[in-house]
Regions:
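Positively charged, Gly/Ser-enriched RNA/tRNA-binding surfaces
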Residues: 1-63, 105-173
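Short C-terminal domain-edge/linker segments immediately following a structured domain
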Residues: 41-45, 67, 96-99
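Detector for methionine-enriched segments
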Residues: 50-52, 79, 86
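Beta-rich nucleic-acid/ligand-interaction surfaces
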Residues: 68-80, 169-173
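Acidic, His- and aromatic-enriched active-site or binding-groove loops in soluble protein domains
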Residues: 82-111, 159
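Internal, well-ordered alpha-helical segments in soluble enzyme and binding-protein domains
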Residues: 49, 70-73, 90-93, 105, ...
Length: 173
């Protein structure tokens, strides 16, 4: 009677606070919507969440591109280079690419311990936005297959906004 049934879906909209010092134009307190599905590994729920985001932005009349990535693809950069210990620093550096230059990200990658050639290899990989070209490690191949499944599920769903693969997206890790 008092047990949660799975998969469990939830969402909430509430005030949240930044722990760090807010940058210019940002507030310490702001509203955020979180949506989660727990208790299932089915990719159907990933597609369902993409459909939900699409509906919300349609209702708000805000055209967007919904970006999608897979943790296994991000992990594969470090694993391919045999540097699994640098997964988080590599991912953090890549996630800055929408805000800073490629040269600065290359410097950040070298600061965390990658060689110039290793940093260059990663940056060359992410220039390619075609999902089929990310089969350079068994981990990335799993991520590619999972994302292809999600894109296949979304193909006939009538989305209003475009869902795209973005290999540098790493928010929330």
């Amino acid at each position: 009677q008092h047990q949660i049934s799975f998969p469990f879906k939830r969402y909430q909209i509430q005030a949240v606070w930044r722990a760090d010092r807010p940058q210019r134009g940002r507030y310490r307190e702001f509203y955020q919507c979180d949506a989660d599905v727990v208790g299932s590994g089915s990719l159907v729920f990933e597609a369902e969440l993409m459909e939900m985001y699409d509906r919300v932005f349609k209702i708000l009349r805000i055209p967007v591109k919904i970006q999608l990535n897979h943790r296994a693809i991000l992990e594969s950069f470090a694993m391919h280079l045999q540097r699994p210990d640098l997964f988080i620093p590599i991912t953090t550096a890549l996630d800055k690419l929408d805000k800073t230059s490629t040269d600065e990200v290359a410097q950040d990658l070298e600061k965390v311990g990658l060689t110039t050639s290793e940093a260059s290899w990663i940056l060359a990989q992410i220039q390619n936005k075609k999902l089929d070209d990310f089969h350079f490690h068994e981990n990335s191949t799993k991520g590619v297959k999972d994302l292809q499944t999600v894109f296949d599920l979304l193909r006939h769903s009538g989305l209003n906004n475009e869902v795209i693969f973005e290999p540098t997206l790493a928010r929330g890790l």
